C-alpha cells in the first residue's frame, strides 16, 4: 500500500505540498487560494476499488498479449494483497477529512469492489484458488459493511461506522 499514492502531479511528482497564496482571491473572492494538495499523502482506501474496476474493464474489452496479461495479473495480486491488509483500517475517505481517520463506509464498499473485481479477473484468467479465497474475503467486507455501516434508525448507510449521518456517495 505504501507504493500507491492517491494522486500525483501532472509531471509525476509525488510530493504535492499545499501552500496558501494570500495575495490571490478565488472565485467570487473566496479564500484561501491554495496550490498543491495536502491530501496527496492521505490514506484513502477507496482508490483500490477504482483501480480494480478499470483493470476488470481492461480484461473484458481488450484481449492483450500473454505477456500483458501476466504483467496485469501481477498488479492485480499486489492490489488485492494491499486491500487484504487495509480494509479493516480507518482512512480519510473521499471527503479528505483533515483531522481524523474514520471507518468510512464508501471506502469499505470500494475495498469490496476491489476484491470483487479481483475475483472476476481471476475467473477470466482461470485462477480458481485466487477466485475462491478473494470471494471469501470480499464476503467478509460485505458482512462488516452490513453490520457496521447500516443505521436502522435512519434506514440508511452512513458516512462512517457509528455515525448517524447519511453519505451522499452511497
What are these regions (language model features)?
Residues 1-170:
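Acidic, mature catalytic/reactive cores of soluble proteins
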